[in-house]
Amino acid sequence: NVIAGSKAIAVKQAPAPDDKQARMRQAIANAMARSKREIPHYYLRHGIDLTSAWQWLADTNAKRPVTERLLYGVLLVKAVALALREAPEFNAWFVDGRTSARSGIHVGVAIALRGGGLVAPALLDADKQSVDQLMRNFQDLVQRARAGSLRSSEYSEPTITITSLGDRGVDTVYGIIFPPQVAMVGFGAPRLQACVVNNAITARQIIDCSLSADHRVSDGHRGALFLRAIDRLLQAPEKL
């Protein structure tokens, strides 16, 4: 403040460096509190054998320069997007007490920001993109998210969100739905696990896939079929 005569005049100060982060945390808190207060969540988990996808990815990347290699995450995104064609009730919004089906499949991907906080912009029409297109667009999305240059449509258009904490070693993640969406899919870290295949014990690459869904829109039976569809699609990675 400066003093002019007998009156104190407030001088506008530059925002503190952490103001933006604090505002983001408050926005996240408000959205998540609203979600847990208003949305009757239910949760499902399904272990998916990624061994075939893992081998296909290794073989594919071995033939490519480093700059063109794929991450396994794009296979997960594509499988979820295609599974939504079979389970469209999870590709919807719930607005003003009614379910609103969405025509496009716009998969939001949760991205942690370096300074703290989280955004979940959309890969638009993810079901129509090749895995190579998804890889390029995902890398671009991450770069622009961390640079603060996302487009408004990328914030507002997600019809479902995928979250993954696999790179942090978490086995299973159960997400909180972003309103007005009606579902979130979570992936943990792939891990070697002893499994019985053809009556023999063998090591397989397993990943936990979870579903958080809105019970006003779907039920556990349909949720289970959705997770099974994701599993089935990942068994044929060359067709994604």
State where each predicted segment sits.
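C-terminal catalytic/motor cores of large multi-domain enzyme assemblies
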Residues: N1-L240
